[in-house]
């Protein structure tokens, strides 16, 4: 039996409660049987003790809540942290300064793991503490790439001084990556451009791309044989969707006469209310749902999902959700990056928001082809983003005893380049 230790600031949950990604949950839950797992979590997302016990059973792992020592108390929770932040003495608000208390280091030493994973590149000192093991620092994306893209987006200029704040965060993110220079470890990301950007800013090659696993799947029949097709837009109207969503509202208004009798639009989330009210004035059949307890159950009531994502990096788990459940997905290049799909074969990928009405009209007038594209999207994700497959190749690649070498970049390009559009 091989032994794995995971350190994470967020307790892994099936639907990434109060966190950016459920990557760790789904990858490690689906690990091969010969890997034992112990998780050390600071439980920053405040998951209840009862829920943690359930998660422990679901993923077959021991979960240990890390309690702060005096050092971390002053670096994370004490009011001095606010003062240091203002003086720019502690730019990460404690994450880069966070240390795993000695008690837990001793426990890990006794456990003698074959693999140690630090989830989130922000925890530099924890990585340094655990660098004498076979260490992988696992991130959902490269933070400097995110901020680099954000600085080119109109969101930066939506408020006074916002650009300066983002530029400052960009510099902090680069500094954090450079801190790994003398730490013997490997870096894992779920983004090809994330990997490339990391190499550019650090000059190091100790970083690899791995595909992101899909989450839960609900089997459904794909059928567009109906008078009105159902479209869903979920998530939030925030930094990630600000620019493209504002453009999409204007584009939908312009094409309302061609679309309003063909589609029912549903916006899932509280932040869409103003947009929904605005589009209702133009005669769209439109709904706004603030919250659902079962996200996947709501998703499969629809035929199409639009992802107006203008900023981001890594792989978007919500896009994988939709594709794996057979929804026909329309999204930006940013939304679809790192997913084993291709425009016209397994999704619709827009270069400009103005493309979306043409896609919607094509889908409505070519429902048979649209069903094939949706089915192709589902098959691609269920095959290449299968959690058991991803977990096995990820763990066996970083397990030094296997001798296996996985090239995610080569695999991705080979698979996607072989896909042919049916448009």
Where are these regions (language model features)?
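Conserved catalytic-core segment of nucleotide-activated headgroup transferases in glycan assembly
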Residues: 23, 209-280, 288-295, 300
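Donor nucleotide-sugar binding/catalytic pocket of nucleotide-sugar-dependent glycosyltransferases
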Residues: 136-137, 167-219
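Nucleotide-activated donor-dependent transferases that construct or modify glycoconjugates
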Residues: 1-24, 41-43, 232-237
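Membrane-proximal helix-turn-helix segments that form the acceptor-binding/catalytic region
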Residues: 26-27, 102-107, 143, 154-187
């Amino acid at each position: 039996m091989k032994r794995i230790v995971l350190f994470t600031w967020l307790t892994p949950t099936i639907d990434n409660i109060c966190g950016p990604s459920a990557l760790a949950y789904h990858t490690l839950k689906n690990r091969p049987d010969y890997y034992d797992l112990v998780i050390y979590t600071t439980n920053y997302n405040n998951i209840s003790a009862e829920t943690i016990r359930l998660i422990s059973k679901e993923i077959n792992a021991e979960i240990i809540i890390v309690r702060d020592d005096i050092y971390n108390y002053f670096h994370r929770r004490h009011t001095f942290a606010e003062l240091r932040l203002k003086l720019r003495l502690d730019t990460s608000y404690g994450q880069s300064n966070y240390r795993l208390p000695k008690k837990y280091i001793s426990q890990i030493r006794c456990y003698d793991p074959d693999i140690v994973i630090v989830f989130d590149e922000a925890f530099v000192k924890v990585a340094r503490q655990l660098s004498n093991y076979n260490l992988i620092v696992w991130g959902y994306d490269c933070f400097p790439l995110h901020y680099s893209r954000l600085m080119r987006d109109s969101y930066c200029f939506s408020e006074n001084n916002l650009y300066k704040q983002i530029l400052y965060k960009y510099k902090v993110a680069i500094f954090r990556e450079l801190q790994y220079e003398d730490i013997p470890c490997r870096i894992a990301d779920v983004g090809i451009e994330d990997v490339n950007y990391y190499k550019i800013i650090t000059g190091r090659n100790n970083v690899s791309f791995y595909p992101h696993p899909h989450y839960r799947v609900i089997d459904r029949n794909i059928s567009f044989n109906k008078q009105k097709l159902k479209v869903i837009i979920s998530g939030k109207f925030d930094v990630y969707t600000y620019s493209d969503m504002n453009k999409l509202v204007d584009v939908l208004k312009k094409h309302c006469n061609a679309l309003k009798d063909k589609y029912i639009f549903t916006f899932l989330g509280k932040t869409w209310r103003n947009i929904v009210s605005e589009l209702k004035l133009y005669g769209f059949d439109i709904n706004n749902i603030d919250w659902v307890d079962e996200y996947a159950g709501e998703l499969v009531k629809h035929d199409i999902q639009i992802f107006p994502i203008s900023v981001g990096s890594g792989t978007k788990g919500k896009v994988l959700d939709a594709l794996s459940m057979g929804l026909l997905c329309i999204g930006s290049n940013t939304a679809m990056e790192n997913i084993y799909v291709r425009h016209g074969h397994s999704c619709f990928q827009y270069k400009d928001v103005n493309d979306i009405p043409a896609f919607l009209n094509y889908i409505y007038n070519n429902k048979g082809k649209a069903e094939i594209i949706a089915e192709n999207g589902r098959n691609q994700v269920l095959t290449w983003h299968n959690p058991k497959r991803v977990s096995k190749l990820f763990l066996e690649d970083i397990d030094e005893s296997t001798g296996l070498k996985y090239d995610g970049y080569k695999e991705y390009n080979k698979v996607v380049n072989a896909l042919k559009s049916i448009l």
